[in-house]
Amino acid sequence: MGNLTVSQANNIWSPNGNSLAVFVDGVSGILKLKDALGNVQPFEDYVTVMYGTGGIYSQTANSTPITATTSELTLIDGGVGTLNVPANGFSVGDSYIANLSGIMSAKNNNSLIIRIKSGNVVLAQSQPLVMPAINNQVWNLQVNFTIRTIGGANIASIVTAGEMHVLKLASGTQEGFGFSAINNTTFNTTILNTLNITAQWSSTDVQNSIYTNLFVLTKIY
């Protein structure tokens, strides 16, 4: 893990013998922080939380197209910032907004499901959106979520709401749907949480394709 280069003057003792420390990883060269429970995270993950509101993540490349498959796959690609909130990094009232846009094609009457996740935990998901026949059309998705309570599973609570719109170029109209959910059973703020947004088609038809060319995550409270 590398040598300890900087540490708190009065290290915090914990029952398992760990202490709060900041160090440079000898392999990756990344500045990291070890908390009093022994959890190790990149230091920037903690800094993002401590600095409060503002930009958290900005995608800098198109995501891999989800095409001709019924597998649930991510709409997110690489970027700058972080999608991680470290263990015990949330506070009650923390609120975020995610804005995504991209290009989509679909076969008439095939459907699409959008899921908002933290790791493998589903925070919210849409009902199947039955698509019109479209080709290379613009879509937009906005997701808001707020931490209601913190703690372990069955104690922590998060509310998530999303709204997606797809432009039908031929008619100039939009198709869309909204969804909202509260997760107060499997959401856990005492562990690392990593945001993911996924899409899943109902069929493997080659006309079905979606990718993201813009994604920005912002902490608003």
Can you describe what each PLM-predicted range is?
Residues 7, 34, 115-119:
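Predominantly extracellular/luminal cell-surface or secreted proteins
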Residues 8-9, 14, 23, 33, ...:
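Intrinsically disordered, low-complexity peptide-like regions
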Residues 1-22, 28:
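Extracellular/surface-exposed low-complexity repeats and stalk/linker segments enriched in Gly/Pro
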Residues 20, 34-36, 100:
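Generic hydrophobic/packing signal
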Residues 46-221:
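Surface-exposed molecular-recognition determinants
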Residues 21, 31, 113-114:
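Generic short beta-strand
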